């Protein structure tokens, strides 16, 4: 079986905005969502830079106290983005009760509830003091377990923990399940906590930018003077659906998923690889039946680290050198949204494709010997987009690439 897979709904909760229209405008304007959180320095961080993500307000009219008690920060973000996605897809509560829908979400940590539980045990020496919800908050699968129970989802249900490629792999696997006829509709996405507990060990690697005098200029993918990434987070949700199923229920189709590629570098745990990136991109193109010259835009993984950007630039130059595809990293505006990044960047890419523009790679002022070979969009470019490639790479050498297509009957 080889079914077409389309996207019928999207939702976003990020530092660029908490609805699709606001995020689209932020992308078009090249608006940064990065700021300072001084308590990070007090806690012992080298850098106070972070994406500033609005805290969701989930009232008792939306969810009862019992449910909210089991929801950590990242699950709350994902709940809000999934509400948006179901609404755009015109999937009602009644539809959810009467039809099987799956859920595959990317998430790779839930640090705050784990640390809070440890503090309570150290202080009180009594597990009864932990209360009801912390066990459900503490598991990597917390987003899936919350979404599946809140929305009464009865299809496939598991979490992808694949570092910073988690959100992208979730879309890829949802795509494969629908393509092969195993599911009709799958809620896919990624979520990332933003609390300062969650990123302390990342800061310890010296991977974060310390350009604290200019927060909005700190994330500068591919720029010669980049000094590290800026952590960020939130959630992104996408409704993937079999084309015939979507057509039969009169759904509005936003885009089509036509290719998914993956690979593993097989090297050092934090060592990027141009070869692994090329394999993932090549597989995605082959599955989609398109060539490198057919791609109009590439949403690069580039996080603003020296090695990561260098190796991706090498891979992109090998595959797309001399081709017309424009390249930018939306992380220049969002910072690195980690576990959600592959999903949020799919949303960002689709918003660009729907509105025929390429968001800029802001803060790119000086190329280095690798990025000077790339066709980077450093300002907003209005141009027709029919095929886009979105890259996501992560610790442990995991690589994912998605090819998304403007929908045509």
Language model segments and positions:
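Glycine-/small-residue-rich "gating" segment that lines the acyl/pantetheine channel
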Residues: 124-131, 172, 176, 193-248, ...
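A glycine- and small-aliphatic-rich helix-loop capping segment at beta-alpha/alpha-beta transitions
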Residues: 21-28, 112-128, 177-180, 201-212, ...
């Amino acid at each position: 079986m080889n079914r077409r897979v389309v996207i019928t709904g999207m939702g976003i909760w990020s530092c660029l905005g908490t609805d699709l229209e606001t995020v689209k405008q932020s992308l078009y304007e090249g608006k940064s969502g990065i700021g300072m959180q001084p308590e990070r320095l007090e806690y012992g961080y080298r850098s106070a830079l972070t994406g500033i993500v609005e805290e969701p307000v989930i009232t008792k009219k939306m969810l009862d106290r019992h449910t909210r008690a089991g929801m950590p920060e990242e699950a709350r973000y994902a709940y809000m983005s999934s509400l948006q996605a179901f609404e755009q897809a015109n999937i009602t509560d009644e539809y959810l009760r009467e039809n099987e829908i799956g859920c595959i979400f990317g998430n790779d940590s839930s640090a705050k509830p784990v640390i809070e539980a440890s503090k309570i045990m150290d202080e009180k020496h009594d597990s009864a003091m932990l209360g009801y919800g912390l066990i459900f908050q503490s598991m990597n699968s917390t987003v899936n377990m919350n979404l599946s129970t809140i929305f009464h989802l009865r299809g496939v249900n598991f979490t992808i923990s694949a570092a910073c490629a988690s959100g992208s792999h979730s879309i890829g696997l949802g795509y494969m399940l629908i393509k092969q006829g195993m599911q009709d509709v799958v809620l896919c996405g990624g979520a990332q906590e933003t609390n300062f507990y969650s990123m302390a060990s990342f800061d310890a690697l010296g991977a974060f930018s310390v350009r604290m005098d200019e927060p909005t200029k700190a994330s500068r993918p591919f720029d010669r003077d980049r000094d590290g990434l800026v952590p960020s987070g939130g959630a992104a949700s996408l409704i993937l659906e079999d084309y015939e199923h979507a057509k039969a229920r009169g759904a509005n189709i936003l885009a089509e998923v036509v290719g998914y590629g993956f690979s593993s570098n097989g090297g050092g745990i934090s060592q990027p690889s141009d070869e692994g990136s090329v394999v993932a991109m090549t597989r995605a193109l082959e599955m989609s039946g398109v060539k490198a010259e057919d791609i109009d835009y590439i949403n690069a993984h580039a996080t603003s680290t020296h090695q990561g950007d260098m190796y991706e630039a090498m891979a992109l130059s090998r595959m797309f050198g001399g081709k017309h595809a424009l390249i930018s990293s939306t992380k220049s505006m969002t910072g690195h949204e980690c576990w959600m990044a592959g999903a949020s960047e799919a949303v960002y890419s689709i918003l660009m494709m729907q509105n025929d523009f390429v968001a800029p790679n802001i803060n790119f002022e000086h190329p280095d010997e690798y990025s000077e070979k790339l066709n980077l969009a450093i300002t907003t470019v209005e141009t027709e987009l029919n095929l886009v490639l979105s890259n996501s790479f992560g610790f442990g050498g995991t690589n994912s690439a998605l090819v998304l297509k403007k929908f045509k009957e």
